[in-house]
Structures are given as C-alpha cells and as structure tokens.
C-alpha cells in the first residue's frame, strides 16, 4: 500500500482515536489495493486469452482453409 493514506483528513478529526474511523479508512484503502491487484490480474488474463484465441484461429487454419475459417467467422458476425 502507499505511504500516503487515502482520506488523510480522517486523522485530523478531533478525538478520532476513540472511534473506528481510522480502521474503517484503512479497510477502504485495503479494498482499493485489492481492486487494483484484480485489475492487473484481469489485464494479464485478457492478454493470455487474446494470444490463446490467436493460437486457436491459427490451428483452425491448419485444419481448414483460411477461406473456410473466415467464412465461418463472418457467418456468426465475428
């Protein structure tokens, strides 16, 4: 996590230490960090899926003609 806390104004509230506001803010920050990690994972998975799709199409063109593959793609609006 970043050294710069989100919502730093929470720390400036009078007697905030007697509340759960800092813990709640820290949980929000942890949730945001988790979301950022999931976005990164999703981008990596999209990249893997893209290259797997290219590989599948190349394999299909090894079994059928390029024309047959392209015709099949057009027939389903791809």
From Swiss-Prot:
Keywords: Plasmid. InterPro entries: KleA/KleC-like. It comes from the Bacteria. To E.coli KleC (kcrB1). This is Protein KleA. It comes from Escherichia coli. The gene is kleA.
């Amino acid at each position: 996590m970043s050294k710069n806390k989100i919502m730093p104004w929470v720390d400036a509230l009078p007697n905030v230490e007697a509340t759960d506001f800092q813990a709640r803010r820290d949980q929000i920050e942890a949730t945001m960090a988790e979301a950022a990690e999931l976005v990164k994972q999703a981008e990596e998975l999209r990249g893997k899926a893209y290259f797997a799709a290219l590989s599948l199409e190349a394999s299909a063109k090894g079994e059928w003609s390029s024309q047959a593959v392209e015709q099949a793609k057009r027939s389903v609006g791809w």
